């Protein structure tokens, strides 16, 4: 999830931020879904706005509407807390963010193993999870992105099979998602994660 959050922050969000723009991040976030936004805010002059917790120790999504302004650009929120195991009302949070034209990044590291999010029904722009939280190997995970969002993203890393052609005058990249797979892929990790997902499906 850390790599995924950073890739979304740097490759999709950063080129679209201007000084004074706002990134709303819930107070319940693991720093994997906080630090990338603090970094991109520092780089662009944007600012991170904290979505506070409610009395139940979950993000107060009912208060989100009051935080959204014409400068709000991104909502970063976790599917499930890594501390309490509590789950915010994602549907309500996303509806408010999407109504304001915001991009939504959901950290699914904790929740994916328990109840995978329906990314299309919830209208999630980006959703990330880690392999080891699904009984798979470490060092592997996945990032979902809407096809139109991925098509608008520039590559974060370069080299390997993410290009179709390269000369000293320039290069051409593969279409998404392959242009985000620079270098030799984690082949063993992919096989291990695939086996873990198959096991989860069989035992569900």
Question: Where in this protein do the model-derived segments appear?
Answer:
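Pyridoxal 5′-phosphate
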Residues: 3-204
